Amino acid sequence: MIGRITGLLLEKHPPLVLVDVQGTGYEIDVPMSTFCKLPDIGKKVTLHTHFWVREDVHLLFGFMTEQERALFRQLTKISGIGARTGLAILSGLSVTDLHQAVVSQDSIRLTKIPGIGKKTAERLLLELRDKIDPVAILSEAGAAASNVDKDILSALLALGYNGREVNRALEQLSEGVTVSDGIMQSLKFLSKVK
């Protein structure tokens, strides 16, 4: 398996790039999120790669970050999501945006990606729901900056509320609230919403 490639960037033609590694040129398919971050032609580039083997073709996919590659691997494990669809998803949404869509169960966001219909979006959300840590993702996005917010978030998720409901509840909390008061305020808010 080829896990990473470092070499000279020779060509860029979306979604394909050509990287020269000591005289051998590797054609690598990349999502647009990676393509936009590539250096100029002739510069050194490092890509985290995934080697895709099928009976009729061997393909190399490249990603600027390990998180993109890990998410690509998760996506392609889902029934009906192939490598091209995985690339399309990563081209349409950043890793953080996709994680937020999964946490908030936002299928509309996914259906805006070419090739992703309503059923595929719902299947993606269902399959990825348990594989993504909402606390880590919301922290990345700045939505749960304090430990108090994280504790409230964890408690509400443990009670069975989904990410979208929890986000709305966290947004209405007053500044400097304690964990217990925050949970109580959130539960009151959520009971009115339902």
UniProtKB/Swiss-Prot annotation:
It comes from Nitrosomonas eutropha (strain DSM 101675 / C91 / Nm57). GO terms for molecular function: ATP binding; four-way junction DNA binding; four-way junction helicase activity. Has three domains with a flexible linker between the domains II and III and assumes an 'L' shape. Domain III is highly mobile and contacts RuvB. Homotetramer. Forms an RuvA(8)-RuvB(12)-Holliday junction (HJ) complex. HJ DNA is sandwiched between 2 RuvA tetramers; dsDNA enters through RuvA and exits via RuvB. An RuvB hexamer assembles on each DNA strand where it exits the tetramer. Each RuvB hexamer is contacted by two RuvA subunits (via domain III) on 2 adjacent RuvB subunits; this complex drives branch migration. In the full resolvosome a probable DNA-RuvA(4)-RuvB(12)-RuvC(2) complex forms which resolves the HJ. One of its GO terms (biological process) is DNA recombination. Keywords: Cytoplasm, DNA damage, DNA recombination, DNA repair, DNA-binding. The gene is ruvA. HAMAP family: DNA_HJ_migration_RuvA (MF_00031). Residues 144-194 are annotated as: Domain III. GO terms for cellular component: cytoplasm; Holliday junction helicase complex; Holliday junction resolvase complex. This is Holliday junction branch migration complex subunit RuvA. SUPFAM superfamilies: DNA helicase RuvA subunit, C-terminal domain, Nucleic acid-binding proteins, RuvA domain 2-like. Residues 1-64 are annotated as: Domain I.
